[in-house]
Regions:
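C-terminal structured domains
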Residues: 495-729, 735-744, 752, 756-771
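Short capping segments at the starts of secondary-structure elements
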Residues: 221-231, 235, 241-243
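Acidic, low-complexity/disordered tracts enriched in E/D and polar residues
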Residues: 115-223
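Glycine- and acidic
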Residues: 206, 214-220, 234-237, 377-382
C-alpha cells in the first residue's frame, strides 16, 4: 500500500492521508447576537393564549432594541467590514450607513434593508464553511489509524498566509487592450483553434466535412503553434517553398483565418489561477523592446495596484486600495471594474483572496473508525457510476450504429458522433437523470422512508443489517470510469470542545457525498498544501492510466480559475471539442483527429473505444467522464418528495439530517408584510412542522441555502423576503427545503488561540479498491 493511503477500518476502501479542513472565519456563537429567544417564548405563549397583547408588544420592542444594537456592533467590527469589502466593495455603503445612523436609529425600510444585509453576510461568515478569504480559510491536515483521535494546535493568528489573485476576466481585458496596440499586434501568439486539426493539406473540423487547403495555407497553419505572428511571417517568407512573397501577405492571411474562426490570435490565458503568470510569459516573448516594455509595464501597473490591495491592513485602507485598483484597471483597459453583478460564481470583482488557516491538525483511529459506516454509501456510489456507464454504453452504441450504417464503416469520426452523444449527456433529458433517480429510489426502499410513522425523528441502522440489502440493490464490481474510482465525502465533526475532540468524544455528520470525483482536484485547494506536487503524484499512483480532461469553453457553467482541475498526469489528454482558451499543445487531442469503433473482438457487445492516430485507445465513456461526473457529484439526496425525512444514522454516523419539504404557499410566510405579523406567522409555521429553532432553508429559486434562526427578528424577515420573492417569480408551488442545523453552534470544536470556536468540515478523498475497467 502506498504511503498516501490509510485503510478505512473494516472496509476494503482507503482514505487519502491528506485531509482538507474548511472552516468559517468568525466564531460560530457570534450568530447568537441576532437571536431573540425571549421574544420567541413570549410569541409562542401569545399564540397559545398564555400572553396578552401588551406583553407581546413589550417583548417585541425589547427585541427590536436588541437587534439594533447587535447589528450596529457587527457593523462596527473592522474584520466584518473588511470581509464585506473583499466580497462586494459597493455593498460596504450599507454597513457604513448602519454606523452613521448609530445603534438607536429609527427603523424605516432603508434601515431594515441594512439590517438584512448585515445579517445575511454574518451567517455566511459564522456558520457556513465557504472557502474564500480570511472569512473562510482552509488548511490541510493528516490522518492515520495509529494516531490519537486528534492532535495539533491552532497558531497564534487566524490566518497563516493569504494570496490575492487577479480575476482571469480582468487579465483577459488587459490582454485584449494590449493586443490592440499596433506595436504589439505583430507579436501576438497565433495558434490553430484547439478543436481543429491539419493533416497534410486537409483542415479537419469536428462536425462538418474536412476542407481542402492550398499549399501555402497548409504550411502556414502547420506553424501556428503559439509562435508570434511576426515570427511565423518571417519564417514563411524565408522558406523557399513557403508560398508567401512578403510578411504583409502572411499577416493578411492570418487575419482572414482568424475571422473564419480557424486561428486564435491573441494572448491565450488558461482558465486557471496561473493566468497571470502565463500572460507575463507571453508578454516577455515580444521581441520588439519598446513594445515589450510598454506591455509588461501595463501588467506591472495592474499587479502593483493588486499588491497594494493585498497589503491593506484595515477596512479604510482596503477600500482605498480597491478603489485604486478599480481606477487603474479602468484607466488601463477602458472597461468597467466589475462583471456580471449579482451572479453567483461569477468572479465579479477584479481580485479575490484565498487564505490558509493558522492550524496544525492530525486525526487518528477514533475518527477513522467513525467514518467506516460510509461503506454502504461508497458501494452504492460505485454502482451509480457503473450503472451510468452501462446506460451510456447502450445510448452511445445506438448512435454509433446509426452513424456507422450511414457511413458504411464501423469506424466513425468522433467529431461526428460527439455532438450527437453530447445531447444524451447534457441535453434536455440526459440519460443519467433516470439512473440517479433510481439510485435514490433504491436507497429510500432500503431505509423504508416511505413507511416512516408520523412523529419519528430519527432512523438508526447498523451497517451489518444493511450489508445484504445494499449488496443486492447495488451490485457492481468496479467503478464506471477512471475518475469514478474516487468519492469525496464532506464530513463535520461534533464535539463539545477541543479537548473532547482530542479524547475521541465526537459524532460524525455526513454533509455531502461527492460521488465519482476527486474533489482535491480544484486549483485553489492546493494553495495551503506544503507539497502540492505530492498530491498530483498520489493521484497518478492511483490512476496510472491515461485520462481525458475536457478543454472547456470560457462560458461553461461554473468553469472558473479557482475551481479548475490541476492534478493531471503526464500521460493525460486534453480533449478539445469547441474553441477554448488555454490549450496545452503537448497534451491536446482535438476530437477531429479521433475515431470511434467497437472494441477489438467485441463488435456485438456494445463496448466502444476512442482511437487516436498514434494507436492509443480509451473506452468511449472516458471522453465524456468530466460531464458524467456532473450528474454524480451531488446525486446523494434522500429527501425525495415527501414532507418529512427523519435523521438517518448508520452505526454512529449521521448520513442524512432531518429534513422538511414544503412549498412557498404552504408556509404562509409570503403574504404578511408587517414585521410582528411575519414573526408570529413564522412561529406558528415552526410549531406546525416541529422545526428546530435553527435551520438551513433552501428555496428553489435560490442557488444556496441560507441559515435561519427562527427566534431572530432579522432572520425571520430574511426568510419571509426570500419566500415573497420566490412567490413573485414563480408562484405558490416553489419548493422549500428545510434542514436541521447539525452540527449545532455548541458542537463547534475547532478553536483559535483565544479559545473562540468555529464551524468546520473535513473534505476526504476515498479510493475504491477496484480501478475502472479499461
Amino acid at each position: 500500500m502506498s504511503d498516501h493511503l490509510v485503510p478505512l477500518p473494516g472496509t476494503p476502501w482507503h482514505v487519502w492521508r491528506d485531509v482538507l479542513v474548511r472552516s468559517a472565519g468568525f466564531p460560530a456563537d457570534s450568530v447568537d447576537s441576532l437571536a431573540a429567544p425571549g421574544f420567541a417564548a413570549t410569541a409562542d405563549a401569545y399564540l397559545a393564549g398564555g400572553q396578552g397583547e401588551a406583553e407581546l408588544e413589550s417583548a417585541y420592542q425589547e427585541a427590536v432594541r436588541d437587534l439594533r444594537e447587535a447589528v450596529y456592533a457587527i457593523a462596527a467590527d473592522p474584520r466584518f467590514r473588511q470581509a464585506v469589502t473583499w466580497q462586494n466593495p459597493g455593498a460596504l455603503l450599507a454597513v457604513e450607513g448602519v454606523l452613521r445612523d448609530g445603534p438607536h436609529a429609527s427603523r424605516n425600510s432603508r434601515r431594515r434593508q441594512r439590517e438584512d444585509f448585515v445579517a445575511k453576510y454574518w451567517q455566511r461568515y459564522c456558520v457556513k464553511n465557504d472557502s474564500i478569504g480570511f472569512f473562510g480559510p482552509t488548511s490541510w491536515a493528516t490522518v492515520d489509524s495509529a494516531w490519537p483521535a486528534m492532535t495539533g494546535r491552532p497558531g497564534p493568528t487566524l490566518v497563516r498566509s493569504q494570496t490575492v489573485h487577479l480575476e482571469r476576466w480582468a487579465l483577459v481585458a488587459l490582454a485584449e487592450r494590449i493586443a490592440e496596440d499596433p506595436g504589439v499586434r505583430p507579436w501576438l501568439p497565433v495558434v490553430l483553434q484547439p478543436h481543429l486539426a491539419v493533416r497534410g493539406r486537409e483542415l479537419r473540423f469536428p462536425n462538418r466535412p474536412a476542407q481542402q487547403l492550398t499549399a501555402p495555407v497548409a504550411t502556414l497553419l502547420a506553424r501556428c503553434d503559439g509562435r508570434p505572428a511576426a515570427v511565423v511571417a518571417r519564417e514563411l517568407v524565408a522558406t523557399a517553398h513557403g508560398g508567401f512573397r512578403t510578411e504583409a501577405d502572411v499577416h493578411a492571411q492570418i487575419r482572414e483565418l482568424a475571422e473564419l474562426g480557424v486561428l486564435r490570435v491573441g494572448f491565450d490565458l488558461p482558465v486557471r489561477l496561473s493566468a497571470e503568470e502565463v500572460l507575463r510569459e507571453q508578454l516577455e516573448r515580444i521581441e520588439d523592446p519598446p513594445a515589450r516594455k510598454w506591455a509588461v509595464g501595463l501588467l506591472d501597473q495592474l499587479c502593483a495596484a493588486r499588491d497594494t490591495t493585498a497589503a491593506a491592513g484595515d477596512p479604510a485602507q482596503l477600500t482605498a486600495a480597491m478603489a485604486g485598483l478599480a481606477s487603474t484597471f479602468m484607466e488601463l483597459t477602458g472597461r468597467a471594474a466589475q462583471q456580471r453583478p449579482g451572479e453567483t460564481y461569477a468572479g465579479r470583482t477584479l481580485c479575490h483572496v484565498d487564505a490558509v488557516r493558522d492550524l496544525d491538525l492530525a486525526f487518528g483511529g477514533a475518527v477513522l473508525a467513525r467514518l467506516a459506516p460510509l461503506d454502504p454509501l461508497l458501494r452504492s456510489g460505485r454502482w451509480l457510476t457503473s450503472a451510468i456507464t452501462a446506460a451510456y454504453r447502450d445510448a452511445f452504441s445506438e448512435l454509433h450504429r446509426e452513424l456507422a450504417d450511414e457511413l458504411g464503416s464501423p469506424e466513425v469520426p468522433l467529431g461526428q458522433l460527439w455532438y450527437l452523444a453530447l445531447g444524451t449527456v447534457v441535453g434536455a433529458h440526459p440519460v443519467a437523470v433516470d439512473v440517479v433517480a433510481e439510485f435514490n429510489r433504491r436507497w429510500e426502499r432500503i431505509l423504508g422512508l416511505d413507511k416512516v410513522p408520523a412523529g419519528v425523528h430519527e432512523l438508526r441502522f447498523t451497517t451489518a443489517e444493511l450489508a445484504g440489502q445494499v449488496a443486492a440493490a447495488f451490485p457492481a464490481d468496479a467503478p464506471g470510469w477512471t475518475y469514478a474510482r474516487f468519492h469525496s465525502p464532506d464530513v463535520q465533526l461534533c464535539a463539545t470542545d477541543w479537548a473532547a475532540m482530542a479524547r475521541g468524544e465526537l459524532t460524525v455528520v455526513l454533509g455531502e457525498l461527492h460521488i465519482g470525483v476527486p474533489a482535491f482536484d480544484t486549483d485553489f485547494f492546493r494553495t495551503g498544501h506544503p507539497r502540492p506536487e505530492a498530491l498530483r503524484a498520489a493521484l497518478h499512483h492511483d490512476l496510472p492510466e491515461s485520462r481525458f480532461h475536457l478543454l472547456l469553453p470560457e462560458d461553461f457553467p461554473r468553469n472558473t480559475a479557482r475551481t479548475a482541475a490541476w492534478m493531471h498526469a503526464p500521460a493525460d489528454v486534453q480533449l478539445a471539442y469547441v474553441p477554448a482558451p488555454g490549450a496545452d499543445r503537448d497534451r491536446l487531442l482535438p476530437v477531429s483527429t479521433l475515431t470511434v469503433a467497437p472494441a477489438a473482438g467485441d463488435a456485438d457487445a456494445g463496448d466502444l473505444v476512442v482511437r487516436a492516430e498514434d494507436g492509443r485507445s480509451w473506452p468511449l465513456v472516458e471522453a465524456y467522464a468530466d460531464l458524467l461526473s456532473v450528474h454524480t457529484v451531488d446525486a446523494w439526496k434522500l429527501t425525495g418528495g415527501r414532507g418529512h425525512t427523519p435523521r438517518v444514522v448508520f452505526d454512529d454516523l449521521v448520513v442524512v439530517r432531518e429534513t422538511w419539504r414544503t412549498t412557498v404557499g404552504q408556509t404562509g410566510l409570503a403574504g404578511p408584510t408587517r414585521e410582528r405579523d411575519r414573526y408570529l406567522a413564522a412561529r406558528r409555521w415552526r410549531a406546525s412542522l416541529g422545526l428546530p429553532e435553527r435551520v438551513f432553508v433552501r428555496v428553489a429559486t435560490e442557488i444556496k441555502p441560507c441559515f435561519i434562526d427562527l427566534t431572530s427578528l432579522v432572520y425571520v424577515r430574511i426568510l419571509c423576503n426570500l419566500l415573497r420573492g420566490a412567490h413573485a417569480k414563480a408562484g405558490d408551488d416553489v419548493e422549500v427545503v428545510v434542514t436541521e442545523m447539525l452540527p449545532a453552534v455548541g458542537d463547534a470544536w475547532l478553536a483559535d488561540a483565544d479559545g473562540n470556536r468555529y464551524t468546520s468540515e473535513l473534505r476526504l478523498l476515498v479510493r475504491d479498491p477496484q480501478p475502472a475497467p479499461r
